[in-house]
């Protein structure tokens, strides 16, 4: 089979690869489509351990099932999944391949009406939303007692952002979001209360409800506070770079404080704000090394991830979740390499790059 492997010098190429060997609790998936995430190129450029397979998001069909998986899946079932690409402990686990192992308890069942291309956008975003919204920010699960308050989603037009907006609204939140103005119509379709341009120097104060003086300039992030009348206590930062942490911090109520959940490492300066960091790879419940740190196995994260995957599969079947918009690339796995460069150059906004593996030359 073929896969995208990391070579010496932190480069990557499509090359022959061994078929993954089935492990306890895993399915063997024939990969139909893969989707790209910023973590893919960042891992390659900043760590890039030779010999590992890249990629985290996929859709495909079940080819083989480990007996320990139970009766949840059958051969031929369509699935979407988040897999641990760039994993030195299991170097063949990446999504950018013709075949890939998928942890059965975390796999999503794909409805008949959903395309493989749309399904490929779901895996990472579903797992991340589960950890960020329901473990980190402790929102009630959809169907429970609703949360009666605002949630800020910074980076609302990312794949995680659009799904977080939908989940949060189903949990009762009044969602506000930051995004580039050209992506505002998408967020409005998803039901956000208001959108804010993260490049606006007054962004956070407009959210919190601070009067905006037309003469002179206010601090960065100053717009969000106005809309919430200084009541915002929960924020999800899907970007965690540039000014995102500062804008989220400035948006949080000065009278109440609050909690910010970051998808990557970030810092704030306010003592009345609690940090929560999400690192979605812990959802597998397995120890690993990544980005210069050793991460122990987290049984609780796996248990919660299993519960959330089952809920997500049901919600997808019921038509409650809308996949992120797709930008379909060409040339299969070879095209993925070009897609990684597009992500490096910040050329993709409001859509997810997806590639059909069968189109690999």
UniProtKB/Swiss-Prot annotation:
Disulfide bonding pattern of the chain: none
Cross-referenced PANTHER family: HYPOTHETICAL OXIDOREDUCTASE (EUROFUNG), ZINC-TYPE ALCOHOL DEHYDROGENASE-LIKE PROTEIN C2E1P3.01
Quaternary assembly: Monomer.
Cited SUPFAM superfamilies: GroES-like, NAD(P)-binding Rossmann-fold domains
Gene3D superfamilies with a match to the protein in the record: Medium-chain alcohol dehydrogenases, catalytic domain, NAD(P)-binding Rossmann-like Domain
Binding site for substrate: 124-131, 280-284
Binding site residues for NADP(+): 39-42, 157-160, 180-183, 198, 260-261, 348-349
One GO molecular-function entry: nucleotide binding
Annotated InterPro entries: ADH-like_N, GroES-like_sf, NAD(P)-bd_dom_sf, PKS_ER, Trans-enoyl_RdTase-like
Pathway participation: Secondary metabolite biosynthesis
Job of this protein: Oxidoreductase; part of the hps1-dma1 gene cluster that probably mediates the biosynthesis a derivative of cyclopiazonic acid (CPA). The hybrid polyketide synthase-nonribosomal peptide synthetase (PKS-NRPS) nps1 might incorporates acetyl-CoA, malonyl-CoA, and tryptophan (Trp) and utilizes a C-terminal redox-incompetent reductase domain to make and release the tryptophan tetramic acid, cyclo-acetoacetyl-L-tryptophan (c-AATrp), as the first intermediate in the pathway.
Gene source species: Dothistroma septosporum (strain NZE10 / CBS 128990) (Red band needle blight fungus)
Enzyme nomenclature, EC number: 1.-.-.-
Keyword tags: NADP, Nucleotide-binding, Oxidoreductase
Family from the record: Belongs to the zinc-containing alcohol dehydrogenase family.
Enzyme class, UniProt record, top EC level: oxidoreductase
Name recorded for this polypeptide: Hps1-dma1 cluster oxidoreductase toxD
Keyword Mitochondrion assigned: no
